[in-house]
């Protein structure tokens, strides 16, 4: 643990952009080397334009998968960069501009992935919304609650529901992105933390229900990771000290999360792994 600033104090307007971060995150652009663990597969990564989603898209592509990913209109510069990185790995990118708080958009994400890339092997439910708050709980707005729940929970359920019939054909797998907030919730992120705890429960339940179909369902719980979500949703001083309270004394990079997703997606490496949450937290416990 350390009290030393980790990053320059900074803020952005949500949802945040990679190019406006100082320093820019490491998504594995220069470091990730694939070994063919997902050769010939197709993955759909929600919120895959930046942060952990981009790192996962890069890693999956370098492991041999074509990658579809969703993004919001404001995130197009990041989405274009991610698509180029997937294509640079010799795989086919499919960038889908969709707001997953709409059920029809979740259905479209899955439908277009299968229609344009031919199949679906891996679903990564990564898209999320958080916003640190200063106000009292009694001032919590319905709009804030609705956006957090729809982005983090409804979209996950809708997208997974649409994906299951296609995943049964392979069979494939689902990987949910949860958070250390499910275990050590921050008061300022009450709604976000609650959705992440719910995702843990959903992961276990879906693993039990879909296991007989051969579909594995797991989750990754990142700790404080240097992504656009941080300067776009936290106070500048909080951003500066991101990760300083972890046992490793620093924030993680998206590139340090991606191998966990690759492991869980691999039909050989994780063939008997289902219903678990894998922590990538810098030493913070996830039990």
Which residues are covered by each model-predicted region?
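C-terminal helical subdomain
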Residues: 1-27, 219, 241-269, 273, ...
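The beta1-alpha1 cofactor-binding region of Rossmann-like NAD(H)/NADP(H)-dependent oxidoreductases
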Residues: 76, 97-110, 142, 255-256
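Substrate-binding pocket helix/loop in short-chain dehydrogenase/reductase
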Residues: 134-137, 141-146, 242
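Active-site loop-to-helix junction immediately N-terminal to the catalytic Tyr of the SDR YXXXK motif
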Residues: 135-136, 185-193, 205
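Active-site helix of classical SDR
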Residues: 160, 195
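Alpha-helical segment proximal to the catalytic Tyr-Lys
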Residues: 165, 208-212
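Residue(s) in the substrate-gating loop at a strand-loop-helix junction
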Residues: 179
